[in-house]
Amino acid sequence: MPLSEATIKAVEATADLVAAQGLDFTRAFYERMLTRNEELKDVFNLSHQRDLRQPKALLDSLVAYARSIRKINELQEQGLPVPAERLAELQGFFAVAERIAHKHASVGIQPAQYQIVGAHLLATIEERVTADKAILAAWSKAYDFLAHLFVRREEEIYTETESSEGGWRQTRSFRVEEKAQITERIFRFRLVPAEKGTAVALHKPGQYLAVFVRDPRLSPHRQIRQYSITSAPNHTYYEIAVHRDKQATVSGYLHDHVAVGDLLELAPPYGDFFLEYREPGGQAADGQPSPEPLALHGGAVNFAAERMTPIVLIPGGIGQTPLLSMLRFLAEKEGQAAIRPIFWIHAAHDSRARAFKAEVDAIKVTDLPGLRTTTFLSEVDETMDKKGEDYDFAGRISLNRVPGLAELEADGANPHYFFVGPAGFMVAVEQQLQAWSVSEDRIHFEMFGPFKPLQ
């Protein structure tokens, strides 16, 4: 049921009070919940609790919801995804709503868990913000309203994935068919179903897999991590590339303890950052009717790759992984007949960080001869790095220096830009695109870890 005017006003009136509490509020919430319901430690990424990324993401989302609640209420009958014509009104909340729903699906969130979260959220509001019974009742109704939206959307996501060819719900056992070290800190894993001869669901290029690990050497709790799929969509296998972070637990475990033949538990592919290809005549790559050239899902604009529209892939560091899946996909779908301009613009710390250089070079030579590649290296080793071969420009990324790109934008070709990488890199790329007055519907980005708006 729609929320009453009294409920909406009460939540709007206290949104700033919650915001003023800052991270103290969300840290208190998580401490309370994870102490009283320790089973949820099997769901939450505890490293994101320690570095405060998850508390910050929750605070931003909660405040955005409270401030947008009136307009969200107007759309409650439609649920998610939000109609494109209303998206601009709700950027504060729906910019992250669909992304959150996919992340929840990847860790297997169930409706009963929303009740647990809601109880602890209300208790934290009472302890930290106000004990006013009318306001607490309003927040209770507002939370139930929000939980209903997410439960409904997540069930749609679960059902869609489960009903697809090769699809499943929750987790499924996969065997490590290949494991290869491609740089000092990156291993590639090829994963096939444990049940020989069974299909896997097609992923959309840019999506990720959640890997479920339970090992006492890591933690007494189950660990879940999401890794971007690097392979092109197929029904036989998935490939992921795992970068070992300095403070990592699960990536280190996968590097050091998981071998060929071992089994891993995986959730299906999820994620709202992807390139969705449209065949001529309005058909999606899976053959389903697709009359709309752009598919809007929450706050993410998932580009439908029309034949002439330029595509610009801009990875920073390990941000190559989801974009490599897009590049492989385009190479398979279009190949040497490709008529669109396609750019691969890689910004890396040094030449050793170019994990997929050989493959991108091979794609350019054999599959996409029109692919335009440009590399920026923050640090150049003049004793070993050759300009024009190992890199094109020294220093940080500058889109103005990419041959032909500024001209393409100025000519009104309306390229679509996909970028993934470290936070500073992503802010820099977005600022450069904004300086060119690139519209938001042509800017697509993914952020590893809890989502936060680029600033």
PLM regions with names:
Residues M1-T171:
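Globin-like tetrapyrrole-binding proteins
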Residues S164-Y270, F274, E279-Q283, G287-P293, ...:
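Ferredoxin-reductase
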Residues G206, G319, P422:
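Short, conserved phosphate/pyrophosphate- and ester-handling motifs at nucleotide-, phospho-/glycolipid
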Residues L275-A305, R396-D411:
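Short amphipathic alpha-helix with an adjacent loop that forms part of the alpha/beta core around
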Residues P310-V312, F418:
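Conserved beta-strand elements of the Class I
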Residues V312-E334, F343:
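Phosphate-binding glycine-rich loops and their immediate beta-loop-alpha structural context
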Residues P341-Q455:
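Reductase modules of NAD(P)H-dependent flavoproteins
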